Amino acid sequence: MYTVITVPAFTDNYIWLIRHENHCLVVDPGDAAPVLDRLAALDLQLDAILLTHHHQDHVGGVTALLKHFPHARLYGPKHDPMPDHHGQWLDDGDQINWHGLSLDVIHVPGHTHGHIAYHGHSMLFCGDTLFSGGCGRLFEGTPAQMHDSLQRLAALP
């Protein structure tokens, strides 16, 4: 069984933990402090960091988290890699497997050129592509790219 834990960050962001027993993944850790606090409070081991895109409010905590959990794996978009970190850079159609959980990688350009989303097990982690109130802003992509990306997300089961 997997549990998604919401970790508030900054004034309007969320960081996501995916928990399985005493292990977890973290998605888009823009700030390490609230993640480290939650991991300590729940006695969780961080196995991997999943990034959707390169903006600081999504990657700002990576360095500190990797210092605390040096064996954690780093995953992120192939077309938006973090040059200062060794990671596995993912593209559309790739898949991450962790403790029986399979997450498919979907390239969803629009907010950024290399933006990716992770989908599987009735979960979607789509970074700044889609919010409950609408879509994300365009920083690098075009309206046509964002439209196509939103159509891909809308077609998911």
Predicted segments — roles?
Residues 1-44, 117-133:
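Conserved beta-strand hairpin/beta-sheet module of binuclear metal-dependent hydrolase folds
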Residues 4, 76, 80-82, 104, ...:
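Residue-level detector of functional hotspots within protein domains
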Residues 10-11, 24, 29-104:
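Active-site HxH/HxHxD metal-binding segment of metal-dependent hydrolases
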Residues 18, 28, 53, 65, ...:
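Divalent metal-coordination and catalytic microenvironments
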Residues 48-55, 109-119:
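Short N-terminal signal/transit or membrane-insertion segments
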Residues 55, 88, 95, 105, ...:
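Short, flexible coil/turn micro-motifs enriched in small/turn-prone residues
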Residues 102, 113-157:
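Metallo-beta-lactamase
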